[in-house]
Regions:
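A short acidic, Gly/Pro-enriched loop at the edge of an enzyme's catalytic core
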Residues: 99-110
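A short glycine-rich, Lys/Arg-flanked "PGG" loop and its adjoining helix->strand segment in the class I
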Residues: 124-139
Length: 213
């Protein structure tokens, strides 16, 4: 279901997209969060996609419960299969919109979202919702992309054009492809007062990763 607050998910769920998303792990996408994970902690994983990061988080907090949500039921089926493959029993799934979660206040020790806010029409509203469902003393953990920060060498006109077109398409669809640089401002606007900004990157430099990219 969509409304005036919804953005179009620019990436879609073609197998080529899912293949890239399956490469993601908690170690390469949420390393900043790992030291804070404890057995028994409850986790809300927002925009879980195919579930690889979800599975890593669930293994770290087991037997603590993990609720993995996504706006798209089809990709939740993919995530469910991933969790079954890992024989994890502490994960449940639900469809939900991060801008209106429909969950009780103070429900989770950790609320996590990786590369979600770039696709959301109202990221501040989404952050307010994340804050609402996080328990006092808990952690809202956000990491997001910043496409304007992409660099490559040698410069290739085709990649320059791709980046320009992607950013235009993402914004036309209601998203913000340079969400990363805006996270601090959004969090402040959403009412967070204890904020620890950090950054990370992916480096595609080996023959394997260059071929994949």
């Amino acid at each position: 279901m969509t409304d005036e607050r919804s953005a179009i998910y620019t990436h879609g769920h073609h197998e080529s997209v899912l293949r890239g998303h399956r490469r993601r792990t908690a170690e390469d996408s949420a390393a900043y969060l790992l030291p804070h994970l404890k057995p028994g902690s409850s986790v809300l994983d927002i925009g879980c996609g195919p579930g690889t990061i979800t599975g890593d988080l669930a293994a770290q907090v087991a037997p603590g419960p993990v609720l993995a949500i996504d706006q798209f039921a089809d990709v939740l089926n993919v995530a469910h299969a991933e969790i079954q493959r890992r024989n994890l029993s502490n994960v449940t799934f639900a469809t939900a919109d991060v801008q209106s979660l429909g969950l009780r206040d103070d429900s989770f020790d950790i609320v996590h979202a990786h590369q979600v806010l770039q696709h959301v029409a109202d990221p501040v509203r989404a952050l307010v919702e994340m804050k609402r469902v996080c328990r006092p003393g808990g952690i809202v953990a956000i990491r997001d992309a910043d496409y304007a920060g992409f660099i490559w060498f040698p410069r290739l006109p085709a990649l320059d054009l791709w980046l320009e077109l992607y950013e235009r398409a993402a914004r036309a669809n209601g998203g913000e492809p340079d969400a990363g640089r805006r996270l601090l401002s959004w969090a402040q606007e959403a009412g967070f007062d204890e904020i620890t900004p950090t950054g990370s990157l992916w480096c595609y430099a080996t023959p394997e990763t260059r071929e994949w990219w």
